[in-house]
Amino acid sequence: MKRNRLSFMNKVLQSSPAVKQPKLGCHSSLSQTHMRAALLDWGNLPHHVVLRIFQYLPLIDRARASSVCRRWNEVFHIPDLWRKFEFELNQSAASYFNSTHPDLIQQIIKKHAAHLQYVSFKVDSSTESAEAACGILSQLVNCSIQTLGLISTAKPSFLNMSKSHFVSALTVLFVNSISLSSIKIEDTPVDDPSLSILVANNSGTLRRLKMSSCPHVSSNGILCVADHCQGLRELALNYYMLSDKLLLALSNETHVNLEHLRIDVMSENAGQIEFHSIKRQSWDALIKHSPGVNVVMYFFLYEEEMETFFKEETPVTHLYFGRSVSKEILGRLGLNCPRLTELVVCANGIQVIDTELICIAEHCKNLTALGLSECEVSCSAFIEFVRLCGRKLTHLSIMEEVLIPDDVYSLGEIHTEVSKYLGRIWFPDVMPLW
């Protein structure tokens, strides 16, 4: 490692315009000695060389290095090193990440707030950490942040804090940063009025908005964002926010092409078994306007809650079922999801899904990835599925317990046949025994 670092330093020094290489025969041995001494004196390195080194160092190492000399301390405060920062906040000594020191937080707010552009807050499950994050947010008044991310590493701690406190802190940022382009505020108490402030100040710059599991945002609130933020390219939301009006707004001729739409489908109320449907015409309008959009859907529903879905053609490209899904729903996928490229089924029960799987292979011509767990598929049907998909099936993750031996193929034979059709060595996944 030390040799590699020295080699890297030599390359940097040799390429530096501030360090001229000695010509053989042109200097006395004394001059050469002074030159070597200068090269070995890291305190005399040009600013841009030290800056490049600092960019590879973790913050704590950078801070230690800044105490070497005045020159390095000056580089430590160069704005380029403070464009991106992640505040880490926790209340537990057992946490896997260290909390950002309070003195450093205050130094950043006082000296580098104006330089911050890409800011994230990583908090643990405690409400105190979420409140501390909001306390920092409310002080970022002299900055122009472009990217904001609020990350809860465990349960959504932002949802447990005072809604008014959170909204107040977020509003300060929305008002003072007028060039926000990417925002991740999932699992937070953000509401419609604060989104209106976001739109009023950042409608021309917003490109990405991730706000799944925000219970205080209505379908009208997200519609306001779509109507005014014509440059929005990526959007993540819950299904209850999705509406025909929203899809039509995203399909407006003045709106840029949408690139990524993520939809989390889960019960918003205990006992809810009915969900609103989206008209096929609305989906068609979106695909006509944005033909390359990835429509990603995550389902966290029970079988009886899924009756509404996939009765008509749906342009989903990536589909994940986090709970058990019925044979009937899987059968609809092959008939009504022609754009499907990735399918993950966590469970299906004890019903064999041979027919459904082959139907998907026959009609979903773009399918490149499949994951199955806690399902049952006969070895013959699985091999036929792989044969129909062929080498375009680049990701195939199947638990060994899913495959049921039949009269034609045994578990010992299946990997050879599957490998032949995939054009690469393949084995089913095996559950570890520990």
Curated annotation (Swiss-Prot):
Domain called F-box: residue spans: 39-85
Q: What's the encoding gene here? A: FBXL21
Entry protein name: F-box/LRR-repeat protein 21
Task: Report the locations given in the UniProt record.
Answer: Cytoplasm, Cytosol; Nucleus
This protein's species is Bos taurus (Bovine)
Q: Report quaternary structure and partners.
A: Part of the SCF (SKP1-CUL1-F-box) E3 ubiquitin-protein ligase complex SCF(FBXL21) composed of CUL1, SKP1, RBX1 and FBXL21. Interacts with CRY1 and CRY2.
User: Biological process (GO) annotations?
Assistant: entrainment of circadian clock by photoperiod; protein ubiquitination; rhythmic process
State whether keyword Nucleus applies: yes
Keywords noted in UniProt: Biological rhythms, Cytoplasm, Leucine-rich repeat, Nucleus, Repeat, Ubl conjugation pathway
- Entry function: Substrate-recognition component of the SCF(FBXL21) E3 ubiquitin ligase complex involved in circadian rhythm function. Plays a key role in the maintenance of both the speed and the robustness of the circadian clock oscillation. The SCF(FBXL21) complex mainly acts in the cytosol and mediates ubiquitination of CRY proteins (CRY1 and CRY2), leading to CRY proteins stabilization. The SCF(FBXL21) complex counteracts the activity of the SCF(FBXL3) complex and protects CRY proteins from degradation.
This protein's pathway reads: Protein modification; protein ubiquitination
Repeat region (LRR), residues: 187-213, 214-239, 242-265, 322-347, 349-374, 375-400
GO cellular component terms, alphabetically, are:
cytosol; nucleus; SCF ubiquitin ligase complex
The reply to whether Nucleus figures as a keyword in the UniProt entry is: yes
